[in-house]
Curated annotation (Swiss-Prot):
This is Protein nucleotidyltransferase YdiU. Its EC number is 2.7.7.-, 2.7.7.108. NCBIfam families: PRK00029.1 (NF000658). It is an enzyme of class 2 (transferase). GO terms for molecular function: AMPylase activity; ATP binding; magnesium ion binding. Belongs to the SELO family. The active site is at 249 (proton acceptor). It comes from Pectobacterium carotovorum subsp. carotovorum (strain PC1). Nucleotidyltransferase involved in the post-translational modification of proteins. It can catalyze the addition of adenosine monophosphate (AMP) or uridine monophosphate (UMP) to a protein, resulting in modifications known as AMPylation and UMPylation. Keywords: ATP-binding, Magnesium, Manganese, Metal-binding, Nucleotide-binding, Nucleotidyltransferase, Transferase. Mg(2+) binds at residues 250, 259. ATP binds at residues 87, 89-90, 110, 122-123, 173, 180, 259. It comes from the Bacteria. The keyword Aminoacyl-tRNA synthetase does not apply.
Length: 483
């Protein structure tokens, strides 16, 4: 029997001045193209919800009982400059689903039409960008990285003009919250400190209830936001993910990866990799992400300055770098197969990264192959991947010495490495192949790629082609903010 999800909309009822209520605007010829069975199961949705009879639900044409749709208002700093009012320009929060375990999940329909915050946009999304966000959300989740999720992809016959005419599409994004740093900035710059306080009290009550009645709740909460942000970015750095548009309106208060635009996973290891071809100065380059995270937290701290004194805010911000270094160290030691911490670990890591940079080695492939090394072997299978064999041999000798300090054997170390270093990541060329087929109503590549990304650490030998290094045409794909 098909059970209707239960919606109870806290944001709608508790923060009436933080949004505009409005209805989604359906696309012509909208139909469900694909969905995440795994997420559907987590949400308690049976397969009956994903039949053609339910297309109107996923396209926003038919609201479920209890839904109260709204577009959120927020502001933000974009590329380091204050951009003023922004808000949901094409997304509508349909409602908050109440799950059996007590959690609440936003259903947010992206591409749902014009809102009061659309500015110069048309309120629409195209199939290309929707598929990219769907795949990235699923990939990041199964890599163990905090992220918003993606439930459904809707395609249509609705033409949308970008650099060329494309198919209009919609994505149902699911997350525990869509509150961003920019929500707080919006009311700070409007000189409405009571609204900032109201929002802080709301997010603490909803997501940090353990501190709701604590006199130090603001400090405890902000300190946790700082640490969540640090942990998120260390995950990005460890897996080789570049977000591309780390504006403050794209920063989740829960420390989730949100707003997948011109993102990219590293192919060749390039610390200064820029995935967004609109980022001419490299503000959001891969190796600059940790610094930008802290810069964004300073902007949030400024917005909270009416609630906490400078010393309290600075104390919380000071937790960022230690948290960043601690979590990065833990993740990178696991990538190297190290169970314990040692003074020379950083030298071992930096030595490998330097070699990879010099040779343009593939980031994911190199770490995955490293697991096949053995303590007692003077040479590793990975050696053949390097041109400068002497340099690799020198590094590998140092690495072997470090492994000798570990009690665990090769098999245990290999298990650690192969559950830390993925075999499958979402390379741009793979996403492009899925997009091109899907634009012609063939979802076979999309489905197969999605399946691989749901088990990124497993061997899946029948999908070895999806773990291949990018072909020449796939090495330099340019991705912009156009979506």
């Amino acid at each position: 029997m098909q059970q209707t999800p239960l919606f109870k909309n806290h944001y709608f009822h508790q923060l009436p001045e933080f949004y505009t209520a409005l209805q989604p605007k359906p696309l012509h010829g909208a139909r469900l193209l694909y969905h995440s069975e795994g997420l559907a199961a987590e949400l308690g949705l049976s397969s009956d919800w994903f039949t053609p009879e339910q297309d109107a639900v996923w396209s926003g044409e038919r609201l479920l009982p209890g839904m109260e749709p709204l577009a959120q208002v927020y502001s933000g700093h974009q590329f380091g400059m204050w951009a003023g009012q922004l808000g949901d320009g094409r997304g509508i929060l349909l409602g908050e689903q109440q799950l059996a375990d007590g959690r609440s999940m936003d259903w947010h329909l992206k591409g749902a039409g014009l809102t009061p915050y659309s500015r110069m946009g048309d309120g629409r999304a195209v199939l290309r960008s929707v598929i990219r966000e769907f795949l990235a959300s699923e990939a990041m989740h199964h890599l163990g990285i905090p992220t918003t999720r993606a439930l459904t992809i809707v395609t249509s016959t609705h033409p949308v003009q970008r650099e060329q005419e494309e198919k209009g599409a919609m994505l149902m994004r699911v997350a525990e919250s869509h509150v961003r740093f920019g929500h707080f900035e919006h009311f700070y710059y409007r000189r409405e400190p009571e609204k900032v306080r109201q929002l802080v009290e709301y997010v603490i009550a909803r997501h940090w209830p353990q501190w709701e009645n604590d006199e130090r709740r603001y400090e405890l909460w902000f300190g946790d936001v700082v640490e969540r942000t640090a942990r998120l970015i260390t995950h990005w750095q460890a897996v080789g993910f570049s977000h591309g548009v780390m504006n403050t309106d794209n920063m989740s208060i829960l420390g989730l990866t949100i707003d997948y635009g011109p993102y990219g996973f590293l192919d060749a290891y390039q610390p200064n990799f820029i995935c967004n071809h609109s980022d001419h100065r490299g503000r959001y380059a891969f190796d600059n992400q940790p610094a930008v995270g802290l810069w964004n937290l300073h902007r949030l701290a400024q917005a909270l300055s009416g609630l906490m004194d400078t010393d309290t805010l600075e104390r919380a911000l000071a937790r960022y770098e230690p948290a960043l270094m601690q979590h990065y160290g833990t993740l990178m030691r696991a990538k190297l197969g190290l169970f314990t911490a040692s003074a020379e670990d950083n030298d071992v890591l930096v030595g490998l990264l330097r070699l990879m940079q010099q040779e343009g080695s593939d980031y994911t492939h190199t770490f995955r192959l490293l697991a096949d090394s053995e303590k007692q072997a003077s040479r590793a299978p990975l050696r053949d991947e390097f041109i400068d064999r002497a340099a690799f041999d020198s590094w590998f000798a140092t690495y072997r010495q470090r492994l000798m300090q570990e009690e665990q054997g090769d098999e245990e170390r290999r298990r650690l490495m192969n559950t830390t270093n993925p075999k499958f990541i979402l390379r741009n060329y793979l996403a492009q192949m899925a997009i091109e087929r899907a634009e012609n109503d063939d979802i076979s590549v999309l489905a197969r790629l999605h399946q691989a990304l749901c088990q990124p650490f497993d061997e899946q030998p029948d999908k070895n082609d999806l773990a291949a290094l990018p072909p020449e045409w796939g090495k330099h794909l340019e991705i912009s903010c156009s979506s």
